[in-house]
Each structure stands twice: as C-alpha cells, then as structure tokens.
Amino acid sequence: GFAVNPSDPDEFNVYNDPSWRPLLQLAEERSDLIRMRSAVRSRSWDPYRTLSSEAESDELRDLVQFHRYVEDEWHCTRVTVRAGGRTLTSTTRRNAQVDTVWTTEHLLKSVEDLDAYLQLPAAFFAEQIDVTPLVEEDVRTGDRGIVMVDTEDPLCAAASLFDMGDFLTVAMTEPTRFHRLLEKL
C-alpha cells in the first residue's frame, strides 16, 4: 500500500516501533505487494505540498503560513491561507500511536470562505506531473507485486476542505461555486 519507512526516527512515525518490524517483514516477504504511488501530490489541495515543490514562489509563500507544534501527545499543524481579503485557517493533529491525521478545523467554513479560496492564483493549484516515483517503485517491486497509481479526484479534494455537513450543503445549494472549485482542484 502506502509508503512505510520504519527507519524514519520521527517520534510520530508509528512504524519505527520495534513491534511493527515482524509484521512489516512478513508482509514484505510473504504477500503480493501493491505499492500505491502518485505522479502528482497525494492531496492536491494541500498548500504545504504546493510550497514544497520546486515551483514555489514568493507570491505563494506570502499567501500561506504553517505553524507546527506538539501539544500533549499530538503533532499539530495550523495552516493559514490569505485569500480574497480573508484569513482561512485549518488545524490537523496526529497522535504518535496512530497513523491517522485528524482535521480538527477545516479550511473552508462558509460560502464566503469558498469565494475567497477561489480567488487564489492558478499557481496555488498547479500540479507538476512526475512519473519517476512510479517507475522507480515498479523496478524495486519487480515481479513481487504491482504499482497502483494513487491520485485523488477533485470531489474528494473538495470534500477535505470542508466539514462534511458544510461540504454537502455547498455542493447541493451552490452548484456554480462548487463546479468552479472542482475545476480548480
């Protein structure tokens, strides 16, 4: 499936715990492998992925800020996006014991937030397609399995921007705005 790196010393990498090693080794050696890899960002809406690319620009850096911190047993990330005269914020957190990122505050909370988000420049949404990771993983996997192209669709990307109730409300009551969002993503 997804990329697992048990040698990564990050305290929030659940797979570096020694208890995982026998299971990971067994799965690697005794099962057909399905390696999920993408030729684009795994989450097209993620501003961190945009700014981490070689195509980053001062314009984009001025629009997006990240604050990473540890609170109790949680690794938290607060993202602030300045768009359309508004300040949009989201917060995620991840526990060191579970490989799940929980969104505790979604970026878009209203139709007005969506309107502001739609004013972001095209570079914010730009994708750099690179099939190299797929080819490299295919060579490593060999005849032990397959490489599955893992790319999200615009509908899932849009859903992740909102609380589910807000997402459904906007999708049903604001079809023109929602379609514009899907076109951007």
Language-model segments: what does each one mean?
Residues 1-185:
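Catalytic cores of TIM-barrel enzymes
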